[in-house]
């Protein structure tokens, strides 16, 4: 279901149902979106050359933390871009080539969270002898020690269907047992610890949404409390998203569980099984915390199993 006239949209999109190709089709509505068909050309690009549009690619990698500085980006396939691609490939357990191969492009084009990937990697060994993949924000911010309850509220506009609110309430409940914090909905948006907003394109922070596909949502580190979802997505708030006739449908609860992890202080994980993995394909349900998520939140809040 969507925030627009979802019944009419469902009928319209269902008539256009088609099988997904090997590369997801993502419309280039914003600075961080990719066009599925046009992106194939990137496989022919080679370092040391100049290609129109690479400045936008560099901006994309800058937004996600792979290029730390933000000069006036040019269209040269230079060492900066090669380094960014290699780091990205390593982070996603891809073959490290420094080039835009098919698997790298497929990963780039998978819809994702808008929070940067490069923050702080713990690089610690867990009690099971495995290397952890969870990360934290800079300086490891968290909610104050001893916090047992946080309030959350939905923006008065746009008004949300109760199914949307229920999906997000379920998402909060996934974190309560491992962080020992209860989440209570309130009607006071201005005073709530966590403020939830569905918005389109530019919406008052430095991270505009890009229309359907691309960036699905983002949330800010503690104790900011802002949590935003792209209102232009086709959100499924109830029912089985895996059976949706809409190929671009996203499970709201799944994305919300991820964004709440950011609200609590977790960065992204390179563990594909983790809730905090940055990307999620359409028609996918993923709501249960993985061990990496649990280890990360316990490390941050000093909670023992």
From Swiss-Prot:
- Which residue positions carry a glycan here? 95, 123
Known Pfam families for this protein?
Answer: Peptidase_M10, PG_binding_1
Q: What is its EC number?
A: 3.4.24.-
Report residues binding Zn(2+). 113, 258, 262, 268
| MF terms in GO | metalloendopeptidase activity; zinc ion binding
Xref: Gene3D superfamilies: Collagenase (Catalytic Domain)
Paste the cofactor note. Binds 1 zinc ion per subunit.
Q: Where is the active site?
A: 259
Q: What top-level branch of life does the organism fall under?
A: Eukaryota
Propeptide ranges, please? 29-133
SMART domains (UniProt xref): ZnMc (SM00235)
Residues spanned by motif Cysteine switch: 111-118
> One biological process GO term for this chain?
proteolysis
UniProt keyword list: Glycoprotein, Hydrolase, Metal-binding, Metalloprotease, Protease, Signal, Zinc, Zymogen
Check the UniProt entry and state the signal peptide residues, or none.
1-28
Q: Which cofactor does it need?
A: Zn(2+)
A GO CC annotation given for this chain: extracellular matrix
PROSITE patterns, sorted: CYSTEINE_SWITCH, ZINC_PROTEASE
According to the UniProt entry, the note on domains is: The conserved cysteine present in the cysteine-switch motif binds the catalytic zinc ion, thus inhibiting the enzyme. The dissociation of the cysteine from the zinc ion upon the activation-peptide release activates the enzyme.
| Record function comment | Matrix metalloproteinases (MMPs) or matrixins may play a role in the degradation and remodeling of the extracellular matrix (ECM) during development or in response to stresses.
Q: Which family does it belong to?
A: Belongs to the peptidase M10A family. Matrix metalloproteinases (MMPs) subfamily.
- Name-wise, this protein is Metalloendoproteinase 1
